[in-house]
Amino acid sequence: MKQLEKLRDRIIQRVDVNLRRFDFDVPGFLKYYVPLNKMIKYYALYGITPHHPLHYQFNYSNLAGSNLLGRCKVDNSILYKCDIRGDELKSSGDVLHYEGTDIPLDYDETILIKDSFLIKTLVHNCSHNPENPELFLIKNTVSSAYVNIHGSWTEGCFLNPFSTVDLTSLHGCAVGTFAYLQVGELWHEQIPPGQIWVKAEDQFDFKYNYPVKVLKKYIDFHPDRRPTGIFIDFLESRKEDFQDVFNVVHFSNPVAVPKSASLSPYAVVKPKTRIADNVLIAQHAYIESSVLGKGANAQEHCYIIDSKLKGNNVTAHGAKLIDVVLENNVFVGFNSFLRGTFEFPLRVGEGVIVMPHTIIDMQASLTIPPGHLVWGLIRKPQDLKEHSIALEDLAKVKDKLNVGAMEFAGNGKAFVDAFRHRIDHILDANGAYYDGKKNRGHAQRTQHIAYNIIQPHPLGVKKGVYPTIDIRS
């Protein structure tokens, strides 16, 4: 495995140089966190569909256990059990709207992952960098487990476990555990664990920080040891179910799936689950004893257990619902963790927006009223007062607002409108509005994917390194 070791050390050197201003042990992390002998245990998959441009290039890389779709190039990188989902990349002729300027695309957009080490990471959406709209770049970057890189350029960055970078370009940044960023662009910043930051220049700025001591109960991470906490225990207890899925070549749906819905063969769906029209269940999702109403979705790394989704519900990448009832048009953001109990299910009212990286962990009855925004840590009914606001009231804010530890500045209506517009776009893109003829989305376009297996060199100095491959239609 000399070539694989050389590749790892090359990535370490490049990322370490970019993060030299921060006190962070990149070599110690990468040499401990994922042993290289695991890199030869798992095959990789690439998908072919009639709806997505096809071009894959893999050069001097390892792709162990990863799933790729769309136009993807991987160069001098290691991807361990990642989802590289290029089904929302821009196409030639599309127009990027940026600060009043229309930027037409001359070529189909491509995801390029170069000199990077990604671990159990989702890469999705498309580039929002106006300087190079045809390229979604991840370079000199390390991401650890259950990270979401969503429409975000990253150069010279380290992304800690369960962090999300969303519609943001990062340059030389370290993002803390369970932090969420949607801020446009950052240079050489260190984001603390548990910071939730949403900012649109000259419009609004939303910020919340989790109490460090409490957050560690859910997810705690140090570079010299594996992550620990409730999130990890929850995921580890269900890991074997996914192993069974990846051991099967010919798939059959475990439950009835309507013609307008899509269930990935690489999702886990347990009995006593019902799926309605226009439902999307992505790879690495886990559904058990639940009902997904018309237009609901479960994106990558979502877990929905003993829950009911009434319809047109967005469960964004990494969100988890246990003993939860969602009324219509509820949005649950990235990596959120919502847990009720069998005796006291958590009820979320119609039109509620659950901010990304929200934790609602209840041992008592709680109903979130319709039309509210919720965020942060809620463990008892009294917490709702300092972690929620009616969207109607937020829309009236024109200057500053503090609710508990949450700080908001700017135009509340612009914030509410931006979220509602994005949620509507997600539902549309996922095919929730499909009427049998119009408004096709992912639920309809990903029903027929041919998956192909590729594997690395099995022996010798190149053991673990995949052959150089160029696949195109």
Language-model-derived ranges and their functions:
Residues 5-28, 83-138, 145, 149-154, ...:
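Glycine-rich hexapeptide-repeat left-handed beta-helix
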Residues 41, 46-64, 68-69, 73-78, ...:
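Extracellular beta-rich repeat passengers
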Residues 43-44, 53-58, 237-263, 268-270:
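Eukaryote-specific, low-hydrophobicity, charge-rich regions
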Residues 70, 109, 251-253, 265, ...:
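Short, conserved secondary-structure segments in the cores of folded domains
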Residues 258-289, 293-295, 299-300:
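Beta-propeller domains
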Residues 469-472:
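Long, low-complexity, intrinsically disordered segments
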